[in-house]
Design a protein with these regions (language model features):
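C-terminal helix-rich "cap/oligomerization" subdomain common to oxidoreductases
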Residues: 271, 275-291
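Active-site-proximal cap/lid insertion segments
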Residues: 1-154, 166-175, 234-240, 262-266, ...
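Short clusters of small/polar residues that mark proteolytic maturation junctions
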Residues: 120, 229, 257-259
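C-terminal cap/loop subdomain of S1 sulfatases and analogous C-terminal strand-loop tails that border
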Residues: 112-118, 157-160, 165-244, 248, ...
Length: 302
């Protein structure tokens, strides 16, 4: 749970925080994902109850319970973030005072995204967009047009090569997997050989009290394909196995699993081939885990 600076204990106390559109619409994804993970509602498999920690009565109906959870949860989060903002300001003020602001690149990022009620979920771990996407905000007026953005597919393995190039290194060391995306800062065209998809895996099956099933998948510029294999590396604690597929252009909130839609079958087959190739390139073939290999083989064409 978030712990804020005491000076913000009453911040936003009388404010109603707007709710995400899909707060009351858990994804119709698949039997492998429905009800799993940690969330705001009472229907999740996870024993961890946010409402209990926030002092919310479980005698409320589901909708009232979730609404109350959301308001208290978001206010705790935003109170904590308010303190972080204060310290970012302190840093910027110091750089101004020392005359180094224009000689400094400030990067604000994280190791993953985070659910704040979307899909009736909290925490991270899932391949869904709110968790999968990472914040990456850069202040460098000498390099970047303010308020600009770009659509390059970037991985966190690209962070180090980019920072090294910003520091003056001309060539990324061969032992690094990532690539510099400094060209994106300068509004250069995306290189023709830039990646068109990215891979994700969550292997800590049903770990801790958060109960997120193991899965892997691939996200292209428009589509996302996910395979829930649902077990530990040793094959224990099996949960349902299923595929999910989303058209992120038509369904950016990932509410409709189109895996069985005939319209998308050729796209799905192409993504499966790409997913298989990427897993091979990354040595993610589960050779040491034959139980997982059997699940993949049995369900690859299902």
């Amino acid at each position: 749970m978030f712990v804020n600076a005491r000076r913000y204990d009453r911040f936003l106390e009388d404010v109603h925080i707007p709710e995400p559109e899909n707060l009351f619409s858990p994804p119709n994804g698949s039997v492998a994902s429905r009800g799993f993970g940690s969330g705001l509602g009472l229907h999740h498999h996870a024993p961890w109850r946010l409402g209990a920690r926030l002092g919310i009565s479980n005698q409320l109906d589901e909708r009232a319970y979730v609404k109350s959870c959301y308001q208290k949860y978001l206010k705790r989060y935003l109170r904590c973030v308010k303190g972080i903002d204060d310290n970012v300001k302190r840093l910027i003020d110091y750089l101004k005072e020392t005359g180094e602001l224009e000689n400094t690149v400030i990067i604000y990022t994280g190791d993953q995204g985070f659910f704040l009620g979307e899909h009736d979920l909290m925490d991270k771990r899932w391949i869904y967009e709110e968790s999968f996407r990472m914040p990456f905000i850069v202040h460098a007026p000498q390099l970047i047009q303010p308020a600009s953005s770009n659509d390059w597919l970037i991985n966190n393995t690209d962070f180090a090569p980019t920072i090294l190039e910003l520091a003056g290194l001309e060539k990324t060391p061969d032992y690094m997997q990532g690539r510099s995306f400094m060209g994106a800062f300068q509004a250069q065209p995306k290189p023709l050989n830039w990646r068109t998809s990215t891979y994700y895996r969550y292997w800590m099956h049903m770990a801790h009290s958060l109960k997120t099933p193991a899965h892997f998948g691939i996200r292209s510029e428009r589509y996302k394909l996910i395979f829930f294999y649902g077990c530990t590396p040793e094959g224990r604690n099996q949960t349902p196995v299923a595929w999910e597929f989303y058209d992120l252009l038509k369904d950016p909130q990932e509410m409709v699993n189109e895996y069985k839609n005939p319209k998308y079958q050729s796209t799905i087959e192409s993504l499966k081939a790409e997913l298989d190739q990427v897993r091979g390139n990354l040595k993610e073939t589960d050779e040491k885990y034959p139980h997982i290999q059997k699940i993949i083989a049995a369900n690859w064409n299902q």
